Amino acid sequence: CYFPQIWASDDTDALCRAEIQTGYSYGYPQSVISNHVSSCPNHQTLRVTPLETRFQVAAFGIMGYECNLKEMKKEEREAIKQQIILYKKWRKTLQFGNFYRGRSFPDSDGSGSVLAGIHGNVTEWTIVSEDQKQAVGLYLQKMVQPNTQYDVYYAKGLSEEIQYHFYNRRLQHNINEFGDLVNSVAPVHVRQGSLAHQLIAKFVKLDGEIDDVTAYGDTLMYNGVKLKPAFGGTGFNDQVRHFPDFASRMYFMEENEKSKESI
């Protein structure tokens, strides 16, 4: 028996919340944990994290917003609108499914290196519906590390006998986030932060990657899904993940129609 809702922490920083919510999962269902998307820089840590990461961490529980919408940019308000639509679609699974922990930040081996791949740089969650026909996954990165562009997401709690359609939530990225790398494709020089740069960013959005796989549950859990490679210094297109510090992705798994026909 649980309270209908608990205030997990005043700390709404997405990175901190990932660790806090992982801890709560040992004793409480996500249906009672209140998770908020707050403004940035975060009021507790002054950390700046992407709006999508703040949403995706908060979505694994009772999600809400504590932002001044009047002061947000139009594209941020539109992003929030789409986030709410997505959350409502998957709310039953996100709030009442079975929560599984994968890798997590506390797994760190203590080396503290920002140059070498170490344990504790990733948090993975999977929430699976009671009938195991639907699941939602989170893959969250703490820090970018050079030459570690190839990541694998390992699902948990799926049925080994069900064939799933695994796919990501495709995003669009602001060209400002690439800084003066815009000049690698611009026909004329564009000064970073200039009016021209801002105008380009207003009208040109970069399409994110698409991950789309059909596989049985045992494959998704034990072999994992090799995600599209992250940006590694040069070359960006819709087959490359824009995955900077504190970036994350949500992945969705649904029973494949062909799997239903074979039962």
Each language-model region and where it sits:
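Glycan-recognition surfaces
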Residues: 1-71
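Flexible loop/turn segments at secondary-structure boundaries
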Residues: 40-45, 66-68, 74-76, 144-147, ...
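Intrinsically disordered, low-complexity coil segments
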Residues: 42-44, 104-120, 177-179, 212-213, ...
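Catalytic cores of secreted or luminal carbohydrate-active enzymes
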Residues: 55-107
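Conserved, mostly hydrophobic/aromatic
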Residues: 58, 137, 166
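Carbohydrate-binding surface patches
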Residues: 111-161
